């Protein structure tokens, strides 16, 4: 492990002129060496040890050590071969579905199901159905119908057919009637609390033994709007070991106006009925769902068996544990309405729109979800892995610039004006150079101490003389990098005061970081990716006359 960590940290250190950045290296180490994820604690200890070793080396020694450990370069390392995930019992055409509720745009949790369904239907040349499950009017956000399709297009998910459940109510009525006629379902007017008490004891309610003819008459009254506080229940096993499976409801009365249907309908199917009917009629061969749906699978199998339908191949995967951003659609919507969040793409939210705004590329998210796969074990969503995958995509095109946050003015005496040329990208000469002109006054972001030597990146050494009225004064000391090393001088980045460009960076907590970028930052355009050296990758969101607004993508 140590040699692997050493190689990555050396590469990182050389990129930053001899000073390793362990946080930046961590994501890449885990992204390219997933076997180390299971021992992050030991990995952190090794990183701390290796950082101390690297900091004691000169830049030349670091390069020599890296050449020894990775003579062909880390970029040439052959990637670990992953066993591609597969479906069981593939016979002929594969048909699958992604079935969100249109209560808002898609978030990271939705990405797993949509990506995996897309991956398999592409792998087997199958068909993917987008089914919008909108039979609960209280949970429907009208604009979400389009937002979901836009999100899937951005993510690279190819939808072959779109189904909206609220447009299929007559179909559900037909199969509800059949279940009643066959004696497998009944209309129940029991008080909810009363039924719950009986169910817990495994005792049938008074409605269970009514005849199909009596239930059809009640069903017709339900459809005509003549009944309230009733439900249609499916007959299952009244003493089933799981009380929730005992005679569960499949239709209910709902008076809330529907965004698509208004008040035309007031009998709506519950999920287990509508899902089963749709999965059969649409020819689903495989159904991917979280293991929290195992009970629903058992409920739906009752309906399959009553109709004599073929049951699709179910795949139940583990829970994806996502820490950090807000994922609750209701909380997000409430926060937007109250003004707490700026919109569905607020950086604090876990929506795909927020990730897109921050600069996460869809290819990176897609790749990570395929890697997470369909394992039954619960898995933690590793942000560092997403960032590593994203960096692999954007790094090659991201031009480099200096950015000084919370800028402090530094006036240097005893040094002549000097122009330095830096490459826009360390590996791509064709992106050209950028120019920094030192003329005595610069901005820095570090808190500097009087009497201490510092090295200005790519420039020279200075010693701080005094700090007055928030202005730092220093004198030129020397050009030699060896002098800085012998004095253990910190290396700080800087930009000239003259022609500096105001930049606001919005981080993942929606906090605004104010600062200045160098003058050549003016060449970038909206939606470009750049790397602010020693700060992180950012996506340029707005370019205006008075400055730029960027979003922090990741370190």
Curated annotation (Swiss-Prot):
Key word Ligase present: yes
Matches recorded under Gene3D superfamilies: 2.40.240.100, HUPs, Ribosomal Protein L25, Chain P
Reactions this protein catalyses: tRNA(Glu) + L-glutamate + ATP = L-glutamyl-tRNA(Glu) + AMP + diphosphate
Keyword presence, Glycosyltransferase: no
GO biological process: amide biosynthetic process; glutamyl-tRNA aminoacylation
Pfam families from the UniProt entry: tRNA-synt_1c, tRNA-synt_1c_C, tRNA-synt_1c_C2
GO-annotated molecular function: ATP binding; glutamate-tRNA ligase activity
Alphabetical list of CDD domains matching this protein: GluRS_non_core
Keywords noted in UniProt: Aminoacyl-tRNA synthetase, ATP-binding, Cytoplasm, Ligase, Nucleotide-binding, Protein biosynthesis
Example of a GO cellular component annotation carried by this entry: protein-containing complex
UniProt EC number: 6.1.1.17
Motif mapping: 'HIGH' region: 100-110
Subcellular location: Cytoplasm
Stored InterPro entries: aa-tRNA-synth_I_CS (IPR001412), Gln/Glu-tRNA_Ligase (IPR050132), Glu-tRNA-synth_arc/euk (IPR004526), Glu/Gln-tRNA-synth (IPR000924), Glu/Gln-tRNA-synth_Ib_cat-dom (IPR020058), Glu/Gln-tRNA-synth_Ib_codon-bd (IPR020059), Rbsml_bL25/Gln-tRNA_synth_N (IPR020056), Ribosomal_bL25/Gln-tRNA_synth (IPR011035)
EC main group: ligase
Purpose of the protein: Catalyzes the attachment of glutamate to tRNA(Glu) in a two-step reaction: glutamate is first activated by ATP to form Glu-AMP and then transferred to the acceptor end of tRNA(Glu).
Family note: Belongs to the class-I aminoacyl-tRNA synthetase family. Glutamate--tRNA ligase type 2 subfamily.
Stated name of the protein: Glutamate--tRNA ligase
The organism of origin for this protein: Methanococcus maripaludis (strain C7 / ATCC BAA-1331)
Gene this protein is translated from: gltX
